Amino acid sequence: MKKALATILALVMAIGLCSVSWAANPASVSNAETLKTAIGAATAENNTITLTDNVVLNESVEIKKSGVNLVIDLGGKTISGSSLLFDIYSPVTFKNGTIDVTYNGSASICVMWLNGGAKLALENDVIVNAAKSAGATGSVFAVGLYNDCDEAELTINGKITGDNGATINGTITTNTNKVTVNGTIDVAGHALYLAGNGITDINNGACVKGDAGIEIRAGVLNINGGTVESTGTYSAPIANGNGTTASGAALIVAEHTTNQGITVNVNSGNIKAASNGKAIAASDPENKGGDDVKLNVAGGNVVGGIQVEESIEAAKPVAVTGGTFSTDVKEYLAEGKILQKNGDTYTAVTNSGITSGTYTAKPTVPDGYKVVENTDGTFTVEKVGGYYYYQPTTDTKTDGTKGSPKTFDAGIALYVGMALTSAAGVAFVGKKRED
């Protein structure tokens, strides 16, 4: 009996050790079922799942692991499907591989949805391809923040390709959600559609490119570096309470029906439009007045025109305080600023103490400089010309009389020299006559 009990105890201990051994090592998966199982079994200590083969998902997988910062290492493999793949409620990081969807439906979908306070990071070795087939009539985004998001975070260090990039649901009213782009979004449609409230940062090294680079309809957008680019032809915005309003512009600013206000800060980076597009387009398609829409351009390089539609023109939403432009943007200059013209480019500078350059308006110059108006209506700053008169110094005696100059006067010397030469000439001629 004792031997039997000892054997049972040994088996239990062996099973326990096996369980601990599994928990201490990352899970390896090779198909949809083992992926789902591994996600369900993940713990704070055992939080990494690694693919050993390509995985096809025919239905979405929920990631909802409280207290677990899940890491899915794609292992250089691909997770593919034809619709929503991941419904995310807790922190997850994808790295080292590809997530690929080809959609063939009529509704609008996202490959990955963030919910609540979910946090998603796409590392720099990840590609998310959110494509659609030729027969699809609905749009597909790679990542979306769902309408219940609060303190959700999306960080894009990798690359997004396909139909559209990332979006914030338009019904979100809390300014607690965060989108950070350090990587690349290169798509056919909208690279970023920021319909709802949140804070979005575009940083150095980022590339945000599509028919429309970014359309923001609520919240805050900070362009701190990188490139935001449009590849399309500009189309005037139209009212739309459930979708995008315009295309063909690198940066589209159009307040939503939710009337939550917009602040855009262009601090650095490049904003580029195609030849028939616009770099920046601001409008008020929902007739909200535009008083709470602010677009501040303090730096960067803007290639393409700035279009402020009549619907928002009275609100004067654009204020240029710095940056370089391919077009004349003097009508958008903030107070105290002026445009310096350098060939085919214009740079916004402070209109004070200007000592050189050509400008689109008359600049303010200090003493010793003048402004010359050119035939093309521009103004050039030049230094005022003058002459220098040399006044030799003398020593003054105590009786008030002046002594001889201390400094050699070249003018007087020349005069004396000429006089002596003339006298010598007369003497020489006179002597010759005497001979």
Regions found by a protein language model. Give the residues of each.
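Surface-exposed loop/turn motifs in large extracellular/passenger domains
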Residues: 63-73, 87-102, 110-132, 139-164, ...
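Glycine-rich repeat segments that build the extracellular carbohydrate-interaction surface of secreted
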Residues: 41-57, 69-77, 158
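A cross-kingdom C-terminal cell-surface attachment/processing module
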Residues: 411-432
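C-terminal low-complexity, Ser/Thr- and acidic/Pro-rich disordered "stalk" regions positioned immediately N-terminal
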Residues: 368, 375-407
